[in-house]
């Protein structure tokens, strides 16, 4: 088996690398993080760990179980007692946890082991030195004997003069021998001292390490999140509780005896009880200390965050944030969504540092990953011209003449309700036209047309002059900083007045070149074609001055002009390409939707495969219906496009929720009257997205203080069964604008009697909704005076009390109508007639100029000169 590294082994056994290296070091193996570990070294480490913590070590915990069986007599239902068997089981666990004994024992064992090791080593060294000394002495003795024999053989005669030299040699040999023995003994003593010192240091190190490990283990047990029945503190408390429980029985038995005996025994019992209370264990005491200083954190805040999430980021309770926002003037709930600026103010107010993060990093990355290199050449493109003006001033008819097609006849009611996008080839070049609605309800649609355009052609009828939507079109053109060309239409009519048009336009900042301004004027007739060529020439001249250029090659980008849901084709979007080339098969990201282009068609319905700059095109294949005005961008990766679309949808939802600040202080009193307002519920479906937005804005604007238009559901496409069911459940009106209900929806509509209405002209829709709202208004009542009588005399009647003899001066006095009594033109009584007589005959009414007797019910203080006014309450029809 191949060797493994220390890091890999630590991962396998579930320990940190530093701890494993420390255990290797304790086992006598020096290893680093990247070193290999052999099987022999693993076995050596395992043997060491077994020796330290293995099966041979003494047990540290012992569990004892005890069972007690007793019998308890209880009273039965019939007055007889019965015996109940009671079994009590107790489990106790004894743990060996004396830290001092463990440390002392470890120190003694280490010291004894070190001394034995030093003694053995010293004995071995002494034996070796003795052996070496014996060998040296034997060798020296043999050499001396050999020398002596040789000398004796060589010298037969020994003179007395030579004896001092022999003695000197012998003394020198003995001196050398003594010096050698002393050096050997000194060396042995030094080595023994070193071994003893090394053993002492090892024992001290081991004792410190063992003490530190024991301290860490006890601290971990004390600070760890133990179960209430397994922690050391809990076990100590449980043991104390068991002891108290055993003593409680004896105390209860002795209590009655003490009461009987009284006196000293009772006092002793109370004193003993107080002593037991004073020595109660304090093992369950709380050990948390509150921080003395405020904690400042780095809070990372995205574009939106809820109150609970912000509280979690700042490690505070949500109620603290709610209190802080109440101090700042806003009431919020725990699940309310806050925008980034508000969350930043709250966090900084509470003393934290704020780090703003951008959550749309993927979106930014996807949109930047395009073929926009510096080497791509810019080419001239066709101008995008928007036709704007008041309703029925001839915008579509003028465009119709330019295109040589009957477009206006196809619009319902002869008015434009969609943005029409067309491109026209002229002799001098191509022009792309956007035809916008002129009705007041299509303000947002006209604004989108001005945003996506290069030149605005303002159509003004020569016989009608400047109208409200004309002024609005001028404002859109100025806001978009777009050049404005005025086309004065209907010049063929005899009542055409050019000077009036110029004068009215000059009041709104549009001056003709003849009057010293910089706006080009063209006088045209959409009926005869007069001046149309001059208008086209002026458009191309203005485009040449603007030097319109765009990238033709590369990934396309554009804007959604219109979108709809087709029953057979699915979501369809009309896109005006602004740069690059849009091809079939490209992956497009349109606002909240995405998809791969399955088919492309031009404005005439012909299939095409690509479209360059300034070309309007219909695309199929999106995941849903995009909103008009969304930017359309070609991206590389469909998966990333899907992620960006989902992120945008979530962000749109969060922003929508953040705007619904129902609980703000400034809205609180307005919300109190919500129950008093009547609601007209509407389920709205339209053919295209732009018309849907326009109708929604118009209907919402009809709301008053008494009646509110509530669009509970809206969408693009046919009316479905789901829409019909929702309308039936919420008592709503179903409105279809240029769409129809399918078969399943018609069944539900008939069975539930849902009010279904179809419209093709927006005027009729708004008028009928107004009429429905008028019917929901609370009726208004008005008091109308029908007669006036003057009191001429007062008579007393025993039955009726005071009777006023009156002359009718105005109108008719009716007996059934309520009256008022006026004195000096001040109302002093309001009630009803009790009797009305003429010549002692009861009558129903008395006309002007006749005398009559009037008895007022429950009122006798009628005086001469008073006036009696008769009135009736009339209901007045209300209008919006």
From Swiss-Prot:
One of the essential components for the initiation of protein synthesis. Protects formylmethionyl-tRNA from spontaneous hydrolysis and promotes its binding to the 30S ribosomal subunits. Also involved in the hydrolysis of GTP during the formation of the 70S ribosomal complex. Residues 489-492 are annotated as: G4. Residues 249-262 have a biased composition (Basic residues). Residues 525-527 are annotated as: G5. Residues 143-228 have a biased composition (Basic and acidic residues). Coiled coil: none annotated. The lineage of its organism: Bacteria, Pseudomonadati, Pseudomonadota, Gammaproteobacteria, Alteromonadales. GO terms for cellular component: cytosol. The keyword Coiled coil does not apply. HAMAP family: IF_2_B. Residues 389-396 are annotated as: G1. It is found in: Cytoplasm. The gene is infB. Residues 435-438 are annotated as: G3. Residues 414-418 are annotated as: G2. Residues 380-549 form the tr-type G domain. InterPro entries: DNA-bd_dom_put_sf, EF-G-like_DII, EFTu-like_2, IF2_assoc_dom_bac, IF2_II, IF2_N, P-loop_NTPase, Small_GTP-bd. This is Translation initiation factor IF-2. It holds the Pfam family IF-2.
